[in-house]
């Protein structure tokens, strides 16, 4: 009987201790995070990009209208006077730049800069769940809240970043911050995500990018308006865009 007492004590202690929470489904975590950034498959997002010098002095501002659609497709229309009429089209891993007065789309890379440290891939508002495979690093404390730390590996070579370290709020899976790495595994940028509300966030209103390679300048990508709207399929064809520059 005396030999059974330690066993009974161990069983009783294990019953009283809190059970470890099951690890979350990383696929669901990533899909939830995307919903704060791109809530619908077909959206029009009005975007303002501001750059700041390393001392915090405002530098430049640009305006963009971004059309997102199914099949990893985005069309970026440049609205500022210095870029008026220029367009960037993304279809899958292919990116094209269309200039006013030309009928030949130019291929570019998703990492090519549009303004400051905002690249074509950043402005195009890509979905992490479509382009990356996620693994759970663990639960951590970040931004004064409990977070899930994910490691995202690119599924293809055509994305802006080959690896992303992403931190999501533990309860709502709200994106909080990210480290963005190039194919060489160099840390290119650090991103911080600003929601529309601290208490009850429904969407990301701003992404703040800080360069980690050279000038340490700051670029703020602010989403000023979102609207669910489908556009003609021809808008996602580079040759059709070249023939119809006014999108009439």
Predicted regions and their residues:
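N-terminal secretory signal peptides that target proteins for export/translocation
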Residues: 1-2
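Bacterial N-terminal signal peptides
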Residues: 6-16
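Signal peptide processing junction and immediate N-terminal pro/mature segment
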Residues: 18-20
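Flexible, processing/modification-adjacent segments and terminal tails
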Residues: 22-42, 48-49, 57, 82-84, ...
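N-terminal, post-signal-peptide region of Sec/Tat-exported proteins
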Residues: 44-75, 79-81
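Solvent-exposed strand-loop boundary residues in beta-sheet-rich modules
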Residues: 53-55, 101, 183-184, 213
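Gly/Pro-enriched, hydrophobic low-complexity segments
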Residues: 108, 145-238
């Amino acid at each position: 009987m005396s030999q059974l007492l330690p066993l009974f004590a161990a069983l009783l202690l294990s019953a009283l201790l809190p059970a470890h929470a099951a690890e979350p489904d990383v696929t669901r975590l990533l899909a939830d995070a995307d919903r704060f950034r791109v809530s619908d498959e077909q959206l029009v997002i009005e975007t303002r990009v501001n750059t700041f010098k390393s001392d915090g002095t405002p530098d430049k501002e640009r305006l963009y209208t971004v059309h997102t659609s199914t099949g990893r497709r985005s069309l970026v229309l440049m609205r500022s006077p210095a870029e008026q009429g220029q367009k960037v089209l993304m279809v899958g891993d292919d990116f094209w730049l269309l200039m006013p007065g030309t009928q030949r789309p130019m291929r570019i890379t998703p990492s090519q800069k549009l303004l400051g440290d905002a690249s074509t891939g950043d402005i195009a508002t890509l979905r992490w769940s479509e382009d990356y495979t996620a693994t759970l690093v663990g639960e951590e404390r970040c931004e004064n809240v409990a977070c899930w730390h994910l490691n995202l590996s690119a599924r293809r070579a055509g994305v802006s970043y080959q690896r992303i370290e992403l931190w999501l709020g533990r309860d709502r899976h709200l994106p909080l911050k990210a480290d963005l790495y190039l194919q060489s595994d160099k840390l290119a940028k650090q991103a911080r995500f600003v929601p529309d509300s601290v208490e009850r966030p429904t969407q990301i209103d701003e992404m703040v990018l800080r360069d980690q390679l050279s000038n340490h300048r700051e670029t703020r990508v602010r989403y000023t308006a979102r609207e669910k709207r489908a556009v003609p399929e021809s808008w996602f064809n580079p040759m059709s865009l070249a023939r119809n520059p006014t999108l009439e």
